[in-house]
């Protein structure tokens, strides 16, 4: 399963981790994915969304 928000498409970012000696190694910053049940025309559907999207859904009262 892809580490991607199913509603907004937000995915992981990549970059380098740096030590004090300025050594670097590649790493990924993954999205904080949460399971949520949202309201749809046909009832409700379970989706994987980021924590920020979940806050927005709660703000607009779109959770089932």
Curated annotation (Swiss-Prot):
GO cellular component: ribonucleoprotein complex; ribosome
One of the GO biological process terms: translation
UniProt cross-references to Pfam families, sorted A to Z: Ribosomal_L28
SUPFAM superfamilies linked to this entry: L28p-like
Disulfide bonds: none
InterPro entries per UniProt: Bacterial_rp_bL28 (IPR050096), Ribosomal_bL28 (IPR026569), Ribosomal_bL28/bL31-like_sf (IPR034704), Ribosomal_bL28_bact-type (IPR001383), Ribosomal_bL28_sf (IPR037147)
Range of residues in the leader sequence: none
Superkingdom of origin organism: Bacteria
GO molecular function: structural constituent of ribosome
HAMAP family in the cross-refs: Ribosomal_bL28
Name of the protein in its database record: Large ribosomal subunit protein bL28
Originating species: Ureaplasma parvum serovar 3 (strain ATCC 700970)
